[in-house]
Amino acid sequence: VSRYVLDTGIVLGFLRGAPYARHVIDTYDPLSPPNLAVQSVVSVAELESLGFKNKWGQQKLDKLDELVRKIPIQDINHPAILRKFSEIDAYQENKHPSLSIPSGKSGFKLGDNDIWIAATASAMQAVILTTDKDFLPLNNVFATVIYIDPNGCK
């Protein structure tokens, strides 16, 4: 049994029918029991925003709604997720009281939306499946991060 948090890029790949999305299904099978995959409510908001800004047609919006209903949505209003957000935010600035960024590194910057997604995975003890390398500094610190190269799966 594996638990996954699918980042926005992975869900977008499912929506588009991208080859890397097929790779995720074939390799990790996140949507089939006994595995559990969720998406953060933050990813849903990012996808809705993307559709709004890019003036997606009704057909694509309907497809997004259908996909969003298939993948459980994890709210961020949970004490463990709120705590992990604080910890990850401090860690990225090398201000965490008990965790240090590896020697030779000065810090890194995650956007707040990515921190929420990572905090969700960390609180759930889930693997982050992502197309975003920005999550990599968190690998094996707050969660296991599996980077999927969106251009590497043709």
Q: Model features per residue range: what roles?
A:
Residues 37, 72-74, 145-147:
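Conserved beta-strand scaffold positions in the cores of enzyme catalytic domains, especially
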Residues 54-58, 92, 146-149:
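Short, hinge-like loop/turn segments at secondary-structure boundaries
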Residues 1-40, 49-66:
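Short, well-structured N-terminal submotif of metal-dependent ribonuclease cores
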Residues 118, 122-154:
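Acidic, PIN/NYN-like endoribonuclease modules and their adjacent C-terminal/linker elements
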Residues 73-127:
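Active-site neighborhoods of divalent-metal-dependent phosphate/nucleic-acid chemistry enzymes
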Residues 11, 44-47, 135-136:
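A generic structural signal for short hydrophobic patches within well-formed alpha-helices
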Residues 7-8, 47, 85, 121:
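Generic structural signal for small/hydrophobic residues in well-ordered secondary structure
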